[in-house]
Amino acid sequence: MGLQGPAKVAIIGTGYVGSSTAFALLFSPLVKEMVLVDVNHAKAEGEAMDLAHAATLIRPVEVYAGRPADCAGSRIVIFTAGANQQPGQTRLDLIHRNTAIVRQALPEILHYCPEALVLMVANPVDILTYVAWKISGLPENRVLGSGTVLDSARFRHLLSRHYRVDPRNIHAYVIGEHGDTEVPVWSLANVAGVDLEEFYLMDGMREEEAFRVEISHQVREAAYEIIERKGVTSYGVALALSRIIECILRNEHSVLTISSVIRDLYGIDGEVALSLPCLVGNEGREKVLAIPLVAREKAALKHSATTLQQLIAQLSL
């Protein structure tokens, strides 16, 4: 599929994440039309009306509430529908309830837009990305999850505050599960190509291992901290999704830590969906990058994959 003009996207679910994503996409010239689909159609209508009014102040874009049939012609299906994570819950606690929602809704949506890419957002996103791939019959490159794109941004944010450097000049990734077993890749983190420890030494300071442990903890716990305080995460994930969508529609070939189905990589036996740095363009996932990991990162990634595989095995797919 070649590079195309402004596209139509379908947003399934108009909760905090779905509506925040729609709002973020109002500012993207790459999106010309958005259809909002929700089991609560009145809620979708209200969100669409509000967004359509806002669009008048930004640029011409068509926003409306629809049914599955109205998803016809969509370039990307953004699946946010699902039960929200509550305070004290892990993302994995949502597995059976949200798997049932994906199984019920996604096939009908794709019936009307069989050429679309699927961007899974609902949690647990890695498992639901795998479920979406399995039940849709789509090739692996066309079923993506938001993965650890936001986690990687959180990692860079915390590093930027510590090192007092623009986060756009920090290269650092979080891989594996979007959740409790995620793996910050410290061995490759750098500022403009300069290893973090060397960068710190330039100021005559020495980095302590305790610092890395604390930053890793903060990245992992960030969503829980936000949910405890405001009940939901929305803005960060909405902009992470906007970034992924623009990367696809602009055919950027950018490196993003999306979740997708992989098999037999990094010593992981069998198949699983998890996040790794991938080239992303208008075909979806174009390539999974084989980044060099140190032994403990490889072990942590394998543990993350095994955790996800054990949970997937509990589902009848």
From Swiss-Prot:
Keywords, sorted A to Z: Allosteric enzyme, Cytoplasm, NAD, Oxidoreductase, Phosphoprotein
Coiled-coil ranges per UniProt: none
PROSITE patterns according to UniProt: L_LDH
EC number(s) given by UniProt: 1.1.1.27
Sequence positions bearing Phosphotyrosine: 224
Positions bound to beta-D-fructose 1,6-bisphosphate: 156, 171
Record pathway: Fermentation; pyruvate fermentation to lactate; (S)-lactate from pyruvate: step 1/1
Activity regulation, per record: Allosterically activated by fructose 1,6-bisphosphate (FBP).
GO cellular component: cytoplasm
Location (main, coarse): cytoplasm
Catalytic activity: (S)-lactate + NAD(+) = pyruvate + NADH + H(+)
MF GO annotations: L-lactate dehydrogenase activity
Residues the entry annotates as binding NAD(+): 17, 38, 43, 82-83, 121-123, 146
CDD domains to which the protein is assigned, alphabetical: LDH_2
Keyword Manganese assigned: no
UniProt subcellular location: Cytoplasm
Record: active site: 178
Role, per record: Catalyzes the conversion of lactate to pyruvate.
Name the UniProt record assigns to this protein: L-lactate dehydrogenase
The organism of origin for this protein: Moorella thermoacetica (strain ATCC 39073 / JCM 9320)
Gene from which this protein is expressed: ldh
